[in-house]
Design a protein with these regions (language model features):
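Conserved N-terminal segment of class I S-adenosyl-L-methionine
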Residues: 1-100, 104, 114-117, 203-208, ...
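Short, glycine-/aromatic-enriched active-site segment of Class I SAM-dependent methyltransferases
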Residues: 6-10, 131-153, 157-162
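C-terminal helical/coil "lid" or tail adjacent to the Rossmann-like core of SAM-dependent
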Residues: 182-215
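A short glycine-rich, Lys/Arg-flanked "PGG" loop and its adjoining helix->strand segment in the class I
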Residues: 114-130
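Feature marks short, surface-exposed loop/turn motifs that line or immediately flank catalytic pockets
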Residues: 75, 139-141, 180
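A short His-aromatic
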Residues: 105, 109
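Conserved S-adenosyl-L-methionine
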Residues: 169-179
Length: 241
């Protein structure tokens, strides 16, 4: 999760984008819990911890431990949570068992995305670890938003699947989110790219009614999103490590 997206006063607890984006993650966690064992959540690039905390709200007692992994945490923040159920750390835990590894919009920030995935793979023990990854989709949507957030690239399914396979990830399922918004986002960004503007985030707080409408529409789409392998604003990868 990129904290820069929150600088314009966006509240992920109500904003349609975050509230809809968490839905496929919750489904992935439900599948990971099907074995009946308490789950360890490793949220890499967690920022505010929004997505991991949503998992804790939903599944609570079924989660044994949550690691919020982010190099932006201060020593004070890490010390305050050391040994707690929800712990802030700088590095990926050395040993992950029965885990769900979450990377929400992280890989696009890395010059070497494969190296990160290989580090995750090396930390996972056994064959009962799962992953859920989101990245921005389609290079044709590249804009000042990507520049502002420090992205290296946007992905399509073959590109994401290839790097996941290279890292040794298994049972990979890929699909797109926000397919319904793709034509509008594509048109707006192509138009804006004709003009020289200071790079900035597209994320803004919205009128309450508009926010509710967008949430309702996108929450509906999320019910069938796993069938969308054609186009969207976000690309998803999930499966086993």
């Amino acid at each position: 999760m990129d904290l820069k997206e929150l600088e314009n006063g966006v509240n992920p607890d109500v904003h349609w984008y975050y509230q809809s984006k968490k839905l496929p993650l919750l489904r992935a966690a439900q599948r990971a819990l099907a074995g009946g064992k308490p789950l360890t959540i490793v949220d890499i690039g967690s920022g505010s911890g929004f997505f991991a905390l949503e998992l804790e709200k939903r599944f609570g007692a079924q989660i044994a431990k949550i690691y919020l992994v982010d190099t932006g945490y201060s020593e004070g923040e890490m010390t305050a949570t050391r040994g707690a159920k929800i712990e802030k750390v700088h590095a990926i835990p050395a040993r992950i068992e029965n885990g769900l590894v979450v990377l929400m919009d992280v890989l696009e920030h890395l010059g070497n995305d494969l190296q990160m995935l290989q580090s995750v793979k090396a930390a996972c023990v056994g064959d009962n670890n799962s992953f859920f990854i989101t990245v921005p989709a389609f290079q044709s949507l590249w804009s000042g938003h990507d520049v502002f957030l420090g992205h290296y690239r946007r992905y399509q399914i073959p590109m994401l699947r290839d790097v996941l396979r290279q890292a040794g990830f298994r049972c990979i399922s890929n699909y797109y989110l926000y397919g319904g918004l793709f034509p509008l986002v594509w048109s707006v960004r192509r138009f804006r790219n004709y003009f020289k503007r200071e790079p900035s985030s597209n994320m803004r707080p919205l009128n309450g009614l508009v926010n509710k409408m967008l949430l309702a529409l996108n929450a509906l789409e999320m019910k069938v999103s796993s069938a969308n392998t054609f186009f969207g604003v976000t690309c998803v990868g999930e499966g086993k490590i």
